[in-house]
Amino acid sequence: MVTSVARGRAAHSEPDYIARAEALAEGFAARAAEHDRTGSFPFENFRELSEAGLLSLTVPAVHGGAGAGARYTARVIGIIGKADPSTALVLSMHYINHLVMARSPTWPVRHSRKLARESVEGLALVNALRVEPELGSPARGGLPATVARRTETGWRLSGHKIYSTGSPILKWYLVWARTDEAEPRVGQFLVPAGLRAPASSRPGTITACAPAAAMTSSSTTS
């Protein structure tokens, strides 16, 4: 783990993730202009990040990750960001979500462990789906139009989202939605990426319809 050495280089007995990031940065920088010109997604960057163990940087050490804190992680992001800002943005979202999972009392343990394990073992990124066509950013307040309904196997979600940073490579979405209960709760629902949207979905949006989504956190609207 690197938490105890967040202010400097890793100890000799620990992997030096700063050095790993620096080793990858040159290649990222060389490819960045072409990705910008063509609008292509840097899939190869994330394969290399995964192979270097950098996708699990903020995964707790108890689950096989590096257990890095925010300060050490910021240094890694800075190195990647200087080489390819787009890659760094997607990576930072992934890191933040794992930091939240590790520290949040509302995250179901079995789900946070599953995502942690997948991030350690392979290419499994996660980010939130929050912004909607009518509401815009939830930072301004308001209830999401995306609705979650109870089923025998979990939750069924229906609604529209505009985007999620890194969506071409995400394995998991954290979908922001409200329940259809008399007193709605608002929370995040863990949904696997790759679900097919109905043909009627409006252009530029994502329709989430998950028959067995898992609710990871919630709060009442009152």
Residues of each region from the PLM?
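Alpha-helical interface subdomain recognition
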Residues: 2-75
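Glycine-rich flavin
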Residues: 43, 47-50, 57-160, 165
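Short loop segments at secondary-structure junctions
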Residues: 104-106, 151-153, 178-181, 193-196, ...
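A general structural signal for short secondary-structure junctions and capping/turn motifs
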Residues: 117-119, 165-166, 180-181, 207-210
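A generic structural signal for well-ordered coil/turn residues at beta-strand boundaries
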Residues: 124, 142-144, 169-171, 185, ...
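A generic structural signal for beta-strand entry/edge sites
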Residues: 152-156, 172, 214
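A short core secondary-structure module
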Residues: 160-200
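Flexible, small-/acidic-enriched active-site or ligand-binding loops
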Residues: 196-222
